[in-house]
């Protein structure tokens, strides 16, 4: 049987993997976006786990709102990435310094 501890451990492992992805690979925009999405997924796992434990469906409802925001974030991030690649011919974050004043 899957307990609350198992679900929280899974959420913690996913969150740690996403943090490692963000801190170890800061130059590739695609890896950064994937790590942020994985971080949101780990939060969703924790919401569902607590919602199941407490018998309250509001946590599961909140997951749908998070998924909606995550989908919008991914769409906007990929649109920025495509525009960046078309103008600079790179997706390396270190080479994009056009906003520096």
Swiss-Prot record:
Its EC number is 7.1.1.-. It catalyses: a quinone + NADH + 5 H(+)(in) = a quinol + NAD(+) + 4 H(+)(out). Gene3D superfamilies: 1.10.287.3510. InterPro entries: NADH_UbQ_OxRdtase_chain4L/K (IPR001133), NUOK/Mnh_C1-like (IPR039428). The chain crosses the membrane at residues 4-24, 30-50, 62-82. The keyword Translocase applies. GO terms for cellular component: NADH dehydrogenase complex; plasma membrane. NCBIfam families: PRK05715.1-2, PRK05715.1-3, PRK05715.1-5. NDH-1 is composed of 14 different subunits. Subunits NuoA, H, J, K, L, M, N constitute the membrane sector of the complex. This is NADH-quinone oxidoreductase subunit K. It comes from Stenotrophomonas maltophilia (strain R551-3).
